Amino acid sequence: MIKPTTDYADLEGCDLIIEAVLEDPKVKADVTQKTQAVVPEGCIYGSNTSTLPISMLAKASQDESKFIGIHFFSPVDKMPLVEIIMGKNTGEEALAKALDYVRQIRKTPIVVNDSRGFYTSRCFMTYPVEATNMLHEGIAPALIENSGVYAGMAVGPFAVLDEVSLELSYHIAEATKKALGDAYKSEACDEVVTRLYADLGRKGKKNRKGFYEY
């Protein structure tokens, strides 16, 4: 049985948890600790994150061997791929249970090792990032958006960011800046996303206004 919930009491007796909260290490650590206070000892803990290193998030866990990344893609009901991320100390039992679960819900798993952004975000995010850099340079947004579609992408780069949510993109960038410090390479897209989300309150599709209005 699969049950979505925000009530920790509902987690008692579960054998697999998939957490999907804000991309903020402190928030995720707090949820991890509160969850593990009520679940059975052998429960596998999956974190749905697109960029935060699993080995880092697992430090908040009571048993790092039971901690694994299970990354779904937006929109979840349409996207078949699920990225399963092995942390430094993730055990084979956690991997087996994650693979079994993903196959049961008829999605396609890929297993990757731990690295910031993993496989999919490191590769795919160049698409909306470079598009937003071009927007900052003054290139017409319609030209950028249509070029992506004409090149064969399912939707344009700005539609992608609205679907994923500008709020999420902003918090990912902030968490990455904090983690990397001086090693973080700021791009023009950071300024654009900050302007849209932090200054104008445009979160994307979730509040019906992002690059587009819905």
Where are these regions (language model features)?
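N-terminal glycine-rich phosphate-binding loop for ADP-containing cofactors
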Residues: 1-214
